[in-house]
């Protein structure tokens, strides 16, 4: 391995050490500029040790490295960045073109090390300024190899130095600012879990109840009354979605259990064909849509059930048996949980069940 390759590897390792030891960009570290100035001066001093340094056979184009502070202040930040990136890129092309004209020699080895320093500077500037389109500035043609080394030193002492010292702090702060991703839209989904629990977990899953009337009664005109409650709707709201007199009037325990009493005037049949297993909560709290009525017992004081048991229908598709509780006749005597004797219930005084 040649000495040039070893020096290039050493410079790359030095840049990597600067990058790892400092959280900022390499161009924001002042040690990088000092290192490049020191190395370029040392490399140029070694050129005098090479014997027989002849001029180049073909002149190479180098950037104009003269610097004017007044002209520099009038330029915008973007034009300054393009000017410096263009100058460093053009210098790298000139060094590579000059090295391509030479046979392996002392000068060729020094030009290889010089190209490594220029690449290091170009990479650091691109990391700070970005890969902008270089601005084609003024150029000069040179045959003297010393002009290659002097061009790098003048760039470092002039435009690059002023850029890093004057514009550098602002660019470094702008580059190191954390980029916080702000969501473009906020979800407007309102979950029912945020509402206070007013029904004590009575109903928590989907259920549907279908009521059909077969004869004259209070609800004879309602041929297909259907109630659908979404998951957790009754569990998280403060009032019941269905507040109709005569429906699920005095339930005690789960609706799909055996203790529920459905009080109606002339409603004959209540089909619960759409009740899925586990649709109702297994608690024993009363689901009272007409507040003020005490829960009715399942057995009368005399030991007889107030209503005949409901016939069970055959199940289909492996579903649980569906209950069809019958509504009692309005003249049926029902026990009262507080009174010692049964109390007779009568239909509502308003007769809305006349057939038209």
From Swiss-Prot:
Identify the tissues in which this protein is expressed.
Found mainly in the liver, kidney and skeletal muscle.
Disulfide linkage = 28-172, 50-106
What is the induction note for this entry?
A: Expression in the liver and bone marrow displays diurnal rhythmicity (a circadian rhythm that is synchronized with the day/night cycle).
Q: Which residues are glycosylated?
A: 197, 206, 235, 249, 256, 336, 351
Is the Glycosyltransferase keyword given for this protein? no
**Could you tell me where the Polar residues compositional bias lies?**
330-339
Which GO terms fall under molecular function for this chain's record?
Answer: cytokine activity; hormone activity
What family name appears in the similarity comment?
Belongs to the EPO/TPO family.
Q: So what does this one do?
A: Lineage-specific cytokine affecting the proliferation and maturation of megakaryocytes from their committed progenitor cells. It acts at a late stage of megakaryocyte development. It may be the major physiological regulator of circulating platelets.
Annotated domain remarks: Two-domain structure with an erythropoietin-like N-terminal and a Ser/Pro/Thr-rich C-terminal.
Record protein name field = Thrombopoietin
The organism that produces this protein has a lineage beginning with:
Eukaryota, Metazoa, Chordata, Craniata, Vertebrata
- Identify the coding gene: Thpo
């Amino acid at each position: 391995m040649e000495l040039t390759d070893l020096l290039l590897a050493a410079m790359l390792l030095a840049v990597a050490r600067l990058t790892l030891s400092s959280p900022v960009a390499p161009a924001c570290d002042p040690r990088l500029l000092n290192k490049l100035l020191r190395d370029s001066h040392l490399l140029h001093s070694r050129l005098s040790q090479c014997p027989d340094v002849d001029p180049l056979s073909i002149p190479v184009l180098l950037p104009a490295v003269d610097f004017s502070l007044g002209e520099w202040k009038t330029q915008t930040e973007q034009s300054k960045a393009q000017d410096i990136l263009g100058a460093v890129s053009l210098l790298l092309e000139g060094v590579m073109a000059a090295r391509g004209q030479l046979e392996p020699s002392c000068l060729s080895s020094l030009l290889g090390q010089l190209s490594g320093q220029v690449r290091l500077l170009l990479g650091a500037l691109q990391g700070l300024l970005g890969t902008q389109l270089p601005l084609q500035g003024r150029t000069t043609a040179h045959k003297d190899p010393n002009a290659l080394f002097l061009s790098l030193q003048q760039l470092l002492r002039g435009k690059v130095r002023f850029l890093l010292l004057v514009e550098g702090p602002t660019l470094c702060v702008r580059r190191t600012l954390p980029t916080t991703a702000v969501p473009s839209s906020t979800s407007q989904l309102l979950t029912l879990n945020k509402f206070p629990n007013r029904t004590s977990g009575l109903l928590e899953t989907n259920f549907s109840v279908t009521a059909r009337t077969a004869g004259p009664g209070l609800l004879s005109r309602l041929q297909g009354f259907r109630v659908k409650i979404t998951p957790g709707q009754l569990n998280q709201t403060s009032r019941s979605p269905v507040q109709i007199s005569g429906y699920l009037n005095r339930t005690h325990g789960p609706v799909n259990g055996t203790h529920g009493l459905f009080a109606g005037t002339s409603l004959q049949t209540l089909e619960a064909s759409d009740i899925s297993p586990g649709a109702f909560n297994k608690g024993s709290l009363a689901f009272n849509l007409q507040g003020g009525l005490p829960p009715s017992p399942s057995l009368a004081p005399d030991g007889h059930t107030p209503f005949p048991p409901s016939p069970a229908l055959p199940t289909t598709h492996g579903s649980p048996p569906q209950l069809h509780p019958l509504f009692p006749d309005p003249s049926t005597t029902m026990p009262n949980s507080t009174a010692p004797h049964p109390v007779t219930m009568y239909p509502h005084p308003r007769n809305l069940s006349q057939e038209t």
